Regions:
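Transmembrane alpha-helical segments of multi-pass small-molecule transport proteins
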Residues: 93-96, 119-140, 157-162, 324-338, ...
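Loop-to-transmembrane helix boundary motifs in multi-pass membrane proteins
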Residues: 88-89, 125-128, 233, 237, ...
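Extracellular/periplasmic helix-exit of transmembrane alpha-helices
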Residues: 61-68, 73, 215, 236-266
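Hydrophobic, small-residue-rich membrane helices and short re-entrant helix-turn-helix hairpins
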Residues: 32, 36-40, 146, 205-237, ...
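Flexible loop linkers connecting adjacent transmembrane helices
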Residues: 2-3, 37-42, 65-90, 256-272, ...
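Hydrophobic alpha-helical segments and their helix-loop junctions in multi-pass secondary transporters
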Residues: 156-182, 191-212, 368-377, 402-414
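Juxtamembrane transmembrane-helix boundary signature
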Residues: 25, 52-86, 94-104, 296
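Extracellular loop-to-transmembrane helix junctions
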Residues: 13, 40-65, 79, 83, ...
């Protein structure tokens, strides 16, 4: 019995030691763009899109686990491996696409910050610049361990969406049915929403950030089992939160009158009739998610570009040691925050576009990942099992199919 307890304590200690990259990456996936996408899905289509969360969770676990494993085994980031195995030209093209997609995501995060604080009558011309400065100082003046602790603390606040979901008192029977009953409508808006839901849940930036964070934290192949548990727990948690966001908006908006919503702020206001707490919790959750992701997305982009093009990177390095890394991080924050402050800028379209761009870029990132992780000279005994490969290729085919369907429907002028 003593041996069993000792082994259990050892496993817990290992888990706590590696806790961070997988859990943070999965949970921050529910950023302001994600919250808007899930809110819009629930407001317009009710409980119908819930069925997508189950397969999305499975694919999210597989993709995140692959990145965590590659980082632990090779000690290199994803863009670093792409450059070494496929050459600088392909890597450069991938980085351009990733920067474009990530920039729209950064804009979405600062739009979320502005929207959440406008609910409390704080002007975006105050909230956005102050948040941008705070985000910049957090990473530039901290180190990996201190930044990670703050990120883990921020994860706790996502429970606000679960509480909001219960306060709205939705139709739980309908929610349960459509969680397992696939519904596919031949409708441009619905398919666009599905691509957005997949794109916001399994975003390309996540794969790059997770692998880089695993490497910087120093997780080794010996600690891989604990790291895998962390990834699985984080992925399940992120889609539980997504479920409650869809359910809250289906109960608060769709049940009364299905409609499009302009932003996540409108979703929060729709919860007011169900009590002040529902409104406050949803609003607080939106601010937390937005500022959390506003830290990580520029960080992920800086990691990816610097690794891919061979520059020094890492939060543990000082500015003079990794000037390009910190320049990119600063540039994305300034440009993202500045865009939100432009008058009459179409922020809502930008937010949904960012999620769809994620969905369009995702198949290409997954193709690189599955090729890399099956290289025996790179991964040794840690190559992918067959069913991982099968699931990943099926995801690639489905995402390409959804994208082509959306293009076809748009061309034919269907609603």
């Amino acid at each position: 019995m003593r041996k069993l307890l000792s082994r259990f304590r050892y496993q817990i200690a290992i888990f706590l030691a590696v806790l961070g990259p997988g859990f943070i990456t999965a949970v921050v996936d529910n950023d302001s763009g994600g919250i808007y996408t899930y809110s819009a899905a629930g407001a317009k289509y009710g409980y119908l899109p819930l069925w997508t969360l189950l397969p999305i969770t499975v694919v999210l676990i597989i993709t995140q686990e692959m990145c965590s494993r590659m980082g632990a085994v090779t000690g290199k980031g994803l863009s670093d491996l792409i450059r070494e195995e496929f050459g600088l030209r392909i890597t450069f093209l991938m980085m351009i696409l990733l920067v474009l997609a990530n920039f729209t995501n950064v804009v979405a995060e600062f739009a979320g910050i502005a929207s959440s604080l406008e609910l409390f009558h704080i002007s975006r011309y105050i909230s956005v610049p102050l948040s941008a400065i705070g985000v910049w100082f957090l990473v530039v003046k901290g180190n990996y361990r201190s930044v990670e602790k703050i990120f883990l603390f921020a994860c706790v606040f996502y429970v606000t969406y679960i509480v909001s979901g219960f306060l709205v008192q939705p139709d739980w029977k309908e929610a349960a049915i459509y969680s397992v009953k696939p519904v596919l409508l031949l409708d441009g808006g619905y398919i666009y929403m599905l691509i957005g839901m997949v794109g916001t849940t399994i975003a390309p930036w996540m794969q790059f950030y997770l692998q880089s964070a695993v490497v910087e934290k120093g997780v080794s192949a010996k600690e891989y089992a604990a790291s895998r548990v962390e990834v699985i727990v984080g992925c399940i948690m992120t889609d539980v939160i997504a479920f409650f966001i869809v359910v809250a908006c289906a109960g608060a908006i769709y049940r009364i009158a299905p409609r499009d919503i302009t932003d996540a702020k409108e979703a929060a206001l729709a919860l007011k009739p169900f009590g002040q707490y529902a409104f406050l919790l949803f609003s607080a959750g939106l601010f937390n998610a937005s500022i959390f992701a506003a830290c990580i997305l520029p960080l992920s982009t800086a990691y990816s570009v610097c690794e891919g093009l061979g520059f020094e990177s890492g939060v543990n390095r000082r500015i003079r040691e990794a000037p390009i890394f910190y320049f990119l991080y600063t540039l994305l924050i300034v440009a993202g925050a500045g865009t939100v402050l432009l008058p009459h800028f179409p922020l809502v379209k930008m937010i949904l576009l960012s999620q769809v761009l994620n969905g369009v870029l995702l198949p290409f990132v997954l193709i690189f990942m599955v090729i890399l992780i099956n290289k025996a000279d790179l991964m040794g005994e840690w190559v992918n099992p067959r069913w991982f490969n099968f699931t990943t290729w099926v995801t690639v085919v489905i995402m390409i199919g959804l994208t082509l369907a959306l293009v076809g429907i748009s061309v034919r002028g269907m609603p």
